UniProtKB/Swiss-Prot annotation:
The keyword Nucleotidyltransferase applies. One of its GO terms (biological process) is DNA-templated transcription. Its cofactor is Mg(2+). Residues 501-687 form the RdRp catalytic domain. GO terms for cellular component: virion component. Disulfide bonds: none annotated. It catalyses: RNA(n) + a ribonucleoside 5'-triphosphate = RNA(n+1) + diphosphate. RNA-directed RNA polymerase that is involved in both transcription and genome replication. Together with VP3 capping enzyme, forms an enzyme complex positioned near the channels situated at each of the five-fold vertices of the core. Following infection, the outermost layer of the virus is lost, leaving a double-layered particle (DLP) made up of the core and VP6 shell. VP1 then catalyzes the transcription of fully conservative plus-strand genomic RNAs that are extruded through the DLP's channels into the cytoplasm where they function as mRNAs for translation of viral proteins. This is RNA-directed RNA polymerase. One of its GO terms (molecular function) is RNA binding.
Length: 1088
């Protein structure tokens, strides 16, 4: 077993280093004789430790267990009072503590003052502005660093340099924290007033960020960047990240393109050796100089110097350092402002009458026309989704907050909850459910607010609207998104594309006679000037659409949608300010509606079109592409002459002047070679992503467990690593150890082993090898997987009680009745389960389940109990396949250029050998005929799991299933009797397997699985006609080959001789695969 278990036992002896501490390893085996020895070994260990005897003799006596069995967990005893952190910290606190400059930030509370100066009393205190919001503590983080330092103090050569760099930075953190004492956290990992009152308010979140940064230091440059950010972020809690990352928007315009990848007609990336010169007017250099001056004014020295040095020759070879600075800037932590300041930010923009009405008119008309274009077809054809919009809305209602806490009765149980789904049920039960009336959000019923915190930007507010708004908007927005899915302009929604496709789109048209205009419109989206024209454009579009149909229900859907827009034109918000709740009129657009993303995209597209139509009066150009992606839009303009400095400058100034005429405070830039938007940036013809995910601070608290957060931490580490920000893996593993350990009593703790945390079971947290998802096939691995499956889902008394109440039952049967035309148990049970799952977001239920889960886990980690299960996992399938493959050495040569310079070498190597893919593999079954047939007649959307179940039923059961969902009998008959049905079986199985194998996550999403270079390494003689079996054999082989290449940097070839007799057996097994949800899969999903 790997590195993890080794580090684990070293970590435990580091933490519990007193005489009274004992570590007892617990082993298990699938071999029953050995298993008995494991049990004996364990009980003797307990016996000896109770009597204070050494365990050394036992280790020798039971060497067979230690050598042949698998480590399950380590039990640690310690009667030590836990102030070890402070004692160890003193050793490192050797330098002068940092002193916060209390005048750096504009808002008083953003200065790092002593807590009692900001909050004189415990009543006034709030941790919301500095809450790390993660289920691990500062003391754990300090321990993890000190463990690493102690372990590496005898390193040599290059490793010694890394040690010294980190030691130096940790000295700063240790000295500062030590000056005030380590803040102790409470049971919920929060820092209370008593602990914080005599300490700087931002101490904890700053120390977490600093630890995250210093544990990501490898080179000397890393050290310089980290030191500067650590020192300055102690004082500057507001603008540091913004200052450091601002220059990037200009830097991307300075690098010549010498060879790049472009999207070809087949939507694949293809190398093009074109050369495009960066044409940069002096004005741009002046702006850059201004940015660097601002950085120096804020006390930065090394970082502006690095940028200045790079500017000498602006080479793409040295550009990764610029990318590094850009990524690092986000790791100073989240900027968390008070809600009042966040809201007022939008409202203090001056409202001027001096705007270009003609442009606004054009803008509104473009929005109107786009809305009409998107919805015209569904409206004219009286689409059933628009007819049954209310039901569709209910089925996809989330369990987020509805804005107010209510007292709800479920049977005999009375609970308080804010959750939408519970409010809907309660309203239905009490005759208060009126989806036809959209509640006003005016001064009488102001909107409660949520928040969104992001590093380097101001806090943004989010509307928490009543659920009626969701129901009214859901169906219409879904139709808009379907339109956007096949419209290239909407980069974010375009069908199954990933960011590589958008990259090739931009580079495609770059040449010496074109320029690209890129604009960050986030300020515009939330500005007051946008709100009237924006809502009016949508309303006008809806009015036009209402005249295209005679169907009363479609008209009603459109009218309700229109009503949400009318209500929101007169919106007030409620903001807690101290003890009072302030009501203010809020005239801007905020997130929180279902339409936010779609409507913003429409508006941003209309905006750039408006601007371009103005510019075209003065210049002659062809617009090659227009794209909008979230808060950004960009366009490539092709002129009929070669671009000159003067032209770039003129176009740039005219574009800015045009935006200014609409009073839009946006950042518009023009370049000939690159762009920078929130999601990605292109420089020198290569694509970069910001590696800015914080590891030790979180944006907000949810109801996830420590295990979930450990998995998210690992997942974040992987994403950052793929994007060029690497944190020490040993440190990440140490954090996982801390976060997955389970306390039994005050002095007893259980630490799961690597096998438990990496086997794909319901408890999986990380991969034993980065980027490689292993599916264990050895006896012990399958044994432990089975053991964990036996305790997968935990019951909750509260949830059962709610589900048994008439309120809940009536709601579920009401949904079923509206949806189904005849009895359909699969769907009814599915709805009931979905609704019951939504209850998990109610804290008491998730707590109850967590407790049950932990007690089951404790039993399991001390002695695994297996059960004979008929359930088959993907591991079983792969285990059956594996023996029939023979491996031989092979060779693939590098044949593609690099286009994503930040990738780790081993991942880069694979892309250079087999190529990349620009599309997401379909893994939800939505492309299958049955899925399309259902969505043609019903608002119900079956999951891939459900489709997988249904498609393997008998033909008459499939017919009944379809008919119950309202599909006409003739269509159902035709479907079952056709070839399409057998194609579907294969297609859905394929989707399901792709889904199970996480093929669209991690680094697998970058590889071209259909690469001919990969195919030629695999030889599988074609026997019998079972496409599903051939598919799984090929996919398994491809994953084996790729995993081997990631691990070893070399290629193997696989030959498979699969007996015909086994094929049918395998095929039958393939229809019974159980999918496993784990913290690990949730974290993958969470990345999405």
């Amino acid at each position: 077993m790997g590195k993890y278990n080794l580090i684990l036992s070293e970590y435990l002896s580091f933490i519990y280093n007193s005489q009274s501490a004992v570590q007892i390893p617990i082993y298990y085996s699938s071999n029953s004789e050995l298993e008995n020895r494991c049990i004996e070994f364990h009980s003797k260990c307990l016996e000896n430790s109770k009597n204070g005897l050494s365990l050394k003799k036992l280790f020798a006596e039971y060497s067979d267990v230690i050598e042949n069995a698998t480590l399950l967990s380590i039990l640690s005893y310690s009667y030590d009072k836990y102030n070890a952190v402070e004692r160890k910290l003193v050793k490192y606190a050797k330098s002068k503590p940092l002193e916060a400059d209390l005048t750096v930030n504009e808002l008083d509370y953003e200065n790092n003052k002593i807590t009692s100066e900001l909050f004189p009393t415990a009543e006034e205190y709030t941790d919301s502005l500095m809450d790390p919001a993660i289920l691990t503590s500062l003391s754990s983080n300090l321990n993890a660093v000190m463990f690493w330092l102690e372990k590496h103090e005898n390193d040599v050569a290059e490793k010694l340099k890394i040690y010294k760099r980190r030691l130096d930075l940790f000295t700063i953190v240790a000295s500062t924290v030590n000056k005030y004492g380590v803040p102790r956290h409470n049971a919920k990992y929060r820092y209370e007033y008593e602990v914080m009152k005599d300490k700087p308010y931002y101490l904890v979140t700053w120390a977490n960020s600093s630890i995250e940064m210093l544990m990501s230091v490898f080179s000397h440059e890393d050290y310089l960047i980290a030191r500067e950010l650590i020192v300055l972020s102690y004082s500057n809690r507001s603008t540091l990240a913004k200052l450091v990352s601002s220059p990037m928007s200009i830097l991307v315009a300075l690098v010549d393109i010498n060879g790049t990848f472009i999207t070809n007609e087949e939507l694949e990336l293809e190398f093009s050796n074109k050369y495009v010169r960066a044409i940069v007017p002096d004005q741009t250099f002046d702006e850059l100089k201004q940015m660097l001056d601002n950085m120096r004014k804020a006390g930065l020295t090394d970082i502006p110097k690095m940028i200045q040095d790079w500017l000498v020759d602006c080479s793409i070879e040295k550009f990764p350092l610029m990318a590094k600075i850009y990524s690092w800037s986000f790791h100073v932590g989240f900027r968390k402002q008070k809600m009042l300041d966040a809201a007022l930010d939008q409202l203090k923009t001056e409202y001027t009458e001096d705007v270009d009405d003609e442009m606004y008119r054009e803008y509104t008309m473009l929005i109107r026309d786009e809305v009409v274009k998107m919805l015209e077809e569904p409206v004219k054809h009286d689409d059933h989704l628009l007819q049954d919009s209310e039901l569709a809305g209910l089925l996809s209602m989330s369990s987020a907050s509805n804005g107010e806490s209510r007292q709800l009765k479920f049977g005999r149980k009375t609970i308080f909850s804010t959750k939408k789904n519970m409010h809907v049920m309660d309203d239905m039960a009490n005759g208060r459910y009126t989806p036809g009336i959209i509640p006003p959000v005016n001064v009488n019923k102001p909107i409660p607010l949520g928040r969104r915190d992001v590093p380097g930007r101001r806090t943004r507010i989010i509307f928490i609207l009543p659920y009626e708004y969701f129901i009214a908007q859901h169906a219409v927005v879904e139709k808009m998104l379907i339109y956007a899915k096949h419209t290239r302009e909407y980069a974010e929604f375009y069908s199954q594309s990933n960011q590589l496709l958008s990259y090739g789109d931009v580079t495609r048209f770059l040449s010496n006679n074109s320029m690209v205009l890129y604009t960050d419109v986030s300020q515009w989206d939330s500005s007051q000037h946008n709100t009237q024209p924006f809502r009016k454009g949508i309303i006008m579009g809806l009015d036009m659409l209402a005249n295209m149909t005679n169907d009363a229900r479609v008209i009603q859907t459109l009218n309700l949608y229109k009503q949400t827009q009318i209500n929101l034109m007169d919106s007030y918000v409620q903001i807690p300010d101290g003890n009072v709740i302030k009501k203010i009129q809020y005239g801007a657009v905020a997130s929180g509606e279902k339409q936010t993303k779609a409507a913003n995209s429409i508006a941003n597209l209309a905006l750039i079109k408006t601007v371009l139509s103005r510019i075209s009066n003065k210049y002659s150009f062809a617009t090659k592409i227009i794209r909008v992606d979230g808060d950004d839009n960009y366009a490539v303009l092709q002129f009929n002459t070669e671009v000159t400095k003067q032209m770039v400058q003129d176009v740039s100034n005219d574009v800015r002047e045009t935006y200014a005429r609409m009073n839009a405070k946006v950042k518009a830039l023009v370049s000939t070679v690159g762009i920078e938007i929130a999601k990605r940036y292109i420089a020198g013809g290569k694509i970069f992503f910001r590696a800015g995910i914080n590891l030790l601070n979180n944006e907000k608290r949810g109801q996830s467990t420590q295990w979930d957060q450990a998995a998210v931490l690992y997942s974040n580490y992987i994403v950052n690593r793929l994007r060029g920000f690497e944190t020490d893996r040993e440190f990440i593993l140490t954090k996982i150890m801390q976060m997955t350990s389970v306390a039994i009593t005050g002095s007893l703790r259980l630490f799961p082993s690597e096998r438990v945390l990496t086997t794909n079971s319901t408890f999986k947290v990380f991969d034993s090898e980065d980027f490689i998802i292993e599916y264990g096939t050895t006896d012990d691995e399958v044994y432990i997987q089975r053991a964990f499956m036996s305790l997968s889902s935990q019951k909750s008394g509260i949830a059962d009680e709610i589900a048994a109440s008439s309120t809940f039952k009536n709601y579920v049967s009401r949904l079923s009745e509206q949806l189904l035309f005849s009895k359909n148990n699969i769907v009814s049970r599915g709805i009931a389960l979905t609704e019951k799952a939504k209850l998990n977001s109610y804290a008491p239920i998730s707590l109850e389940k967590r407790r049950a889960q932990i007690s089951a886990l404790l039993t399991m980690l001390q002695k695994p109990v297996t059960f004979k299960s008929s359930k088959i996992t993907i591991n079983d399938i792969l285990r059956d396949i594996k023996p029939f493959f023979t491996v031989s050495e092979a060779h693939l040569s590098i044949q593609y250029q690099k286009f994503m310079p930040t990738l780790p070498d081993n991942v880069q190597y694979i892309i250079q050998c087999i190529g990349s893919r620009t599309y997401q593999i379909e893994d939800d079954g939505s492309k299958s005929a049955i899925s399309r047939l259902i969505s043609k007649y019903s608002v119900y959307r079956p999951s891939i799991e459900e489709l997988y179940k249904v498609i393997s039923l008998h033909e008459n059961e499939i017919q009944l299933y379809l008919i119950s969902l309202g599909i006409p009998k003739i269509d159902a008959d035709t479907y079952v009797g056709s070839k399409i049905y057998s194609q579907d079986k294969y297609r859905i199985l394929e989707s399901y397997v792709y889904n199970l194998l996480s093929i669209n996550y991690g680094c697998y999403q970058l590889f071209d699985f259909n690469s001919p270079d990969l195919e030629k390494l695999i030889r599988i003689p074609f026997k019998g006609k079972i496409p599903a079996v051939t598919f799984i054999l090929h996919l398994y082989a491809k994953l084996e080959v790729i995993n081997h290449a990631i691990k070893n940097g070399s290629w193997i070839s696989l030959f498979c001789n699969y007996p015909k007799s086994e094929m049918i057996k395998l095929w039958k097994k393939m229809w019974n695969i159980t999918s496993l949800r784990s913290p690990y899969t949730n974290a993958n999903f969470f990345q999405d």
